[in-house]
Structures are given as C-alpha cells and as structure tokens.
C-alpha cells in the first residue's frame, strides 16, 4: 500500500483496525459464556474492506 495515503482512507483503515478486536473478557464473564465470539470480526486475508 502507498505510504502517502489520503487522510480519509487512513482514518477508515484505523477505524476498521480498532473494530477488529476480540470481545472483552468481562463480557464473557457477565453473559456466563453465552457470548464468546464477535460476529463482525474480520481476518485480513479472507474478507477485504471497501476502500
């Protein structure tokens, strides 16, 4: 990817990177392990972003 990115694209990529985290441990504890996975989790090779 180019080093000189437009700021809007850089912000979108940063937002996607922040969203791409696992769910917190306290959520697992609070829900008695009913919620374990994050349905919108994205793996960089499988699912690409719209840029």
From Swiss-Prot:
Signal peptide span: none
InterPro entries: Ribosomal_eL39, Ribosomal_eL39_CS, Ribosomal_eL39_dom_sf
GO BP field: translation
Any one GO molecular-function label of the UniProt entry: structural constituent of ribosome
Gene3D superfamilies assigned: Ribosomal protein L39e (1.10.1620.10)
PROSITE patterns given in the database record: RIBOSOMAL_L39E
The UniProt record lists the keyword Ribonucleoprotein: yes
Keyword Ribonucleoprotein on entry: yes
Keyword field: Ribonucleoprotein, Ribosomal protein
A GO cellular-component term linked to this record: cytosolic large ribosomal subunit
Family: Belongs to the eukaryotic ribosomal protein eL39 family.
Name the record gives this protein: Large ribosomal subunit protein eL39
Organism: Thermococcus sibiricus (strain DSM 12597 / MM 739)
């Amino acid at each position: 990817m180019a080093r000189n990115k437009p700021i809007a694209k850089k912000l979108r990529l940063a937002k996607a990177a922040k969203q791409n985290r696992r769910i917190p441990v306290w959520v697992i504890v609070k829900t008695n392990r009913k919620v374990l996975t994050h349905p919108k989790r994205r793996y960089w090779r499988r699912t690409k972003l719209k840029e």
